[in-house]
Amino acid sequence: TKKATGSNLTQSYVKEFLTAYFTKKDLGENRNRYLPFMTEAAYQQEVNTEKEPATQAYKGYVVDTKLKSATIYIDQENKTAIVQVNYTQTQLQKKNNYANAQTNVLSKTTLRIRYIKQEGKYLVSQLEPILIVDTLTASQEASLPNLNQPKTTEGETNKWQN
């Protein structure tokens, strides 16, 4: 297969980045693979996030992360991609010990990836998790008749209901 160069913002180019970003043996192990896809500032932000104590706490416990699939939406005009990603991980009970490990634990995330073009190549300038709400579900929930009624504690009679 032909390697995407990044001169165009395409699904295959975004997927190449996602593969580099989500495939790793352990925290930080994949930096050299995703660095070529990012601006220096975005890369530094990612490294800083990996160094945070809350993130470091999982090092050695959440391992073997692999990209499984990605749905990629590209907005060429704003140089942005919205990606819905499925990936698996192995979760260890003891650091670096695969005994009793939970393997292939499926996780999902949605990211907005902003790109800028530098020297003829699209680079990730910002990576942020986002939440996409299913408006059909939200509007169905909103149409429920008791949505805005006062909540009651157990054993209390709700005076609004007959």
Protein language model annotation of sequence segments:
Residues 2-64, 68:
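Core segments of small alpha/beta cavity-forming domains
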Residues 75-79, 122, 156-161:
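Intrinsically disordered, low-complexity segments of exported/surface proteins
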Residues 4-8, 76-77, 102:
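Short, solvent-exposed beta-strand/turn "edge" segments of beta-rich domains on protein surfaces
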Residues 1, 31, 35-36, 62-63, ...:
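Generic detector of bulky aromatic hydrophobic side chains
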Residues 68-76:
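Short amphipathic beta-strand and strand-loop transition segments with alternating hydrophobic
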Residues 79-149:
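Exposed beta-sheet edge and beta->alpha loop/turn motif
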Residues 1-18, 139-159:
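N-terminal, intrinsically disordered, polar/charged segments of Gram-positive cell-envelope systems
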